Amino acid sequence: MLSKLNKKIERVFKEEPKEVNCKEYVDHMDIHQPFVCVGYKMDACKTKAEAFEKDFAVNMWLDSIMGPLNPKFQEWLDQRIFTQFVGAEADFTLDHSYILFYAQTVNPNAFIELVNELVQNKSISDEDYQSLHAQAIANNLRGLDHFDGLANDLLRSHFEEYDYIENLNSIQNMKIEQVHAYIKDLDFSHSCVTKILPNDSI
């Protein structure tokens, strides 16, 4: 159907604001232990290449600070700052970006304080980089042997207009200096804390 406006019709998206919509949200559910999530709103990326590389670099850093690679991880478990349900993840795209730290914990405030301390350490050790980088390359190579997954990845890259093989190469060629550059660029000033607490009846 032709447009009566005689003009090209385009989808218009409002620019994502830098500020979070709400700094704290608390809800109650039928659970036995609280859940907490500390989210940080990040600037959207300017190019697809930047989004892919930054996503990989930041998630590598998160694996090094919020996981068994961190020597203090077992100590935090013993102190019950969090349970086995704990993690961190990041997503960087052209229209939005964020970093999340989440956990099940009997002491949400202690977890929040821990996260606030962790994000001040914007670095990754050479040992952690070597380990996580080698693991990522190995996972990519194994992925090339799973043809169903490979077909889906190639199809997705076609529709999202990026080069799948080029992205794999960018991971293989990424140096620790690039990882540090992306980490140092992070701005943690826009945060939101979400708490899911047990109902009084539990």
Task: State where each predicted segment sits.
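Active-site-proximal alpha-helical segments within enzyme catalytic domains
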Residues: 1, 111-116, 182-185
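A conserved active-site cap/scaffold subdomain adjacent to cofactor or substrate pockets
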Residues: 31-37, 43-69
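An aromatic/glycine/proline-enriched structural segment found at the starts
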Residues: 1-45, 199-202
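A common structural junction motif
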Residues: 1-9, 117-126
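Bilobed periplasmic-binding protein-like "clamshell/Venus-flytrap" ligand-binding domains
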Residues: 180-182, 186-192
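M16 family metallopeptidases and their MPP-like homologs
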Residues: 35-45, 51, 73-122, 128-174, ...
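Generic recognition of flexible, low-complexity loop/linker segments
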Residues: 25, 87-89, 180-183
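Hydrophobic alpha-helical transmembrane segments of multi-pass membrane proteins
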Residues: 5-6, 57, 61, 101, ...
